[in-house]
Amino acid sequence: MASSLLILSNSDSGLYDFRKEVLKALLEKGFRVAVSVPDTGYVDKIKALGCDYIPTSFERRGMNPVKDMKLMLFYRRLMKEYRPLAVLTYTIKPNIYGGLAARLTGTPYLVNVTGLGTTLENGGLLQKMIILMYRTALKKAGCVFFQNKGNRDFMVQKKCASGKVRVIPGSGVNLTEHRPEEYPEDGGQIRFVSVMRLMKDKGIEELLAAAQTVHEKHPETLFQILGAYEE
């Protein structure tokens, strides 16, 4: 399929919410777009755009050598079957195992580093292993995209991205579909809103402790959290 593109990601909701415009632009240019991502409820929306869906199952978090090897072999099989013009990967596991599969099959590929993840941020032996895997997986990438300069500088310093790199403007909200609205009346409350993933590594426990301390001294305060629960 010379005009097909293969998209690899770990989140159907993230792909639809933040990269929908990319998918639509590729489709409008005449490409056949196949998407490999676990189904958590957004696949029908992705298919409605005109994308082909490839059922995919893997754990977003954690490292299991056997399961991760199966994922890499699954990606390699997809690339041999679809023979895409190029592969675009998002998020850590698709970046690493999709990148390795692309190298093994000689498929051109582009990588989007959407974040470093707690493993790279925390250091230690596991960090060294991930860095080595990134170096191998990204070595032949046509381009490595980053969401911010900090991630780019870290990966370049660690020699994970030695070729063409770009910092993209961001993956923001489509303000045509999501129009700003007036903030609701607060009734005299002081409101704190945290937009975050509900994970220990992201500081949820510290936030809850701080909220309790502040609320005990200032009952007029209200703390709200917007985000997905992940652990």
What is each residue range found by the language model?
Residues P184-K202, L207-Q212, F223-Q224:
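Conserved donor-binding/catalytic core segment of Leloir-type glycosyltransferases
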Residues E28-K67:
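Conserved nucleotide-sugar phosphate-binding/catalytic loop shared by glycosyltransferases and other
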Residues V37-G41, V195, L222-E231:
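Glycosyltransferase donor-sugar binding loop
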Residues D17-F18, V66, K70-L73, P108-L110, ...:
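Nucleotide-sugar donor phosphate/pyrophosphate-binding loop at the beta->alpha transition
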Residues N10-G14, V195-K200, V214, A228-E231:
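Short donor-sugar binding/catalytic loops of nucleotide-sugar-dependent glycosyltransferases
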Residues I54, R135-P180, R191:
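Donor nucleotide-sugar binding/catalytic pocket of nucleotide-sugar-dependent glycosyltransferases
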Residues M1-D39, C51, V214-E216:
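N-terminal subdomain of nucleotide-sugar transferases
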